From Swiss-Prot:
Enzyme class: lyase
Similarity remark: Belongs to the lyase 1 family. Argininosuccinate lyase subfamily.
Lineage top rank: taxon: Bacteria
Pathway assigned to this chain's UniProt record: Amino-acid biosynthesis; L-arginine biosynthesis; L-arginine from L-ornithine and carbamoyl phosphate: step 3/3
HAMAP family, alphabetized: Arg_succ_lyase
A Pfam family this chain is assigned to: ASL_C2
Family matches, as InterPro entries: Arg_succ_lyase_C, Argininosuccinate_lyase, Fumarase/histidase_N, Fumarate_lyase_CS, Fumarate_lyase_fam, Fumarate_lyase_N, L-Aspartase-like
GO CC, one annotated term: cytosol
Entry keyword set: Amino-acid biosynthesis, Arginine biosynthesis, Cytoplasm, Lyase
Enzyme Commission number(s) from the entry: 4.3.2.1
Entry protein name: Argininosuccinate lyase
Origin species: Pseudomonas fluorescens (strain SBW25)
Amino acid sequence: MSTDKTNQSWGGRFSEPVDAFVARFTASVTFDQRLYRHDIMGSIAHATMLAKVGVLTDAERDSIIDGLNTIRGEIEAGTFDWRVDLEDVHMNIEARLTDRIGVTGKKLHTGRSRNDQVATDIRLWLRDEIDLILGEITRLQKGLLEQAERESDTIMPGFTHLQTAQPVTFGHHLLAWFEMLSRDYERLVDCRKRANRMPLGSAALAGTTYPIDREYTAQLLGFDAVGGNSLDGVSDRDFAIEFCAAASIAMMHLSRFSEELVLWTSAQFQFIDLPDRFCTGSSIMPQKKNPDVPELVRGKSGRVFGALMGLLTLMKGQPLAYNKDNQEDKEPLFDAADTLRDSLRAFADMIPAIKPKHAIMREAALRGFSTATDLADYLVRRGLPFRDCHEIVGHAVKYGVDTGKDLAEMSLEELRQFSDQIEQDVFAVLTLEGSVNARNHVGGTAPAQVKAAVVRGLTLLASR
């Protein structure tokens, strides 16, 4: 006869119930219930394996699976009663299963601990989340390629130190973000590979005495392999840390892109227009059209960076194997995944709708002596050392600042006062088109190279 005074699955050795506040403080069901699909998936695979090795009968297996599928339906219908006193998603589902099918429900946990159960659930969940995020990256990249192709010959100023540097095409600029997102995609694919190793079968920490078939369970759940050490399987969360690191890099890229969009929509730049559906107004200033989506993405990057630091701090002092600290792994991981996915979705919707203001971009590229490097290169081709050419053009730029003339606005006579190597053909070099077309190599800003890069990008997306 049971003498459990706690009503908990682990209450046999306890003589009094858990304090009500402590029960609430230690419960995780309010946030880990989002793992229910993966918890049920893992339990169905575990029950199937237990029947295969003879620990459960086929009838017991079928009863458990039918019960779990019914519970999944209750959860998705919103009729499931989540109980804080049952601590977590695992015990809530197991208790409901026992309510429905009786003592057979108590056999499900044979050869399993919540330690390897939750580690498995999180990996299954993260695997699915990464797949969703990869889809949003691809969708955003497709939008960038479409915009880049349309704007392959749209000229704008390129910047260093936020100062006018050299002319570039808007398409080339957009493709820089495509390249960064490609690396983000690769990092997440690599992260998924390491997350897709099954800890189930590690039990509490040392494995189990039952004749389990871990490879069979892994096959049922779509894992690439089983973990090779039970202590490692239940205790580490490096796969979650790795995801948050990859997510942080991706959010850093989106944050930088957001900063550019905020600048470009400002009255001081006016390079692009964002459709109204991605903006909001002011409660006091009637004229305002605020780029809230990029501003929020820029701000939300801090949440993901915080999740990374939180998980690193969470893990750094833990001895092997499982510790209750690890309950704190889920909220930062969930938030990081949600934030990255939503930010990518917002960008994937917004980028194709950007409307560049071609005339303003071009006018900005005509200011700031953006073709100064082209003049230096022109003189190099005339046989002068580059450092001498750099100094010559620097004097010409100073003259331009003093007279209010860009290099292309100076007469041949004015230019020749700095070098007698300058001839009439220099003016073709000093045009914006001459500047961008001259950079006609792989990775360059020339329109022909932008179009070629778009083709390569589309091929990459098609291969995924």
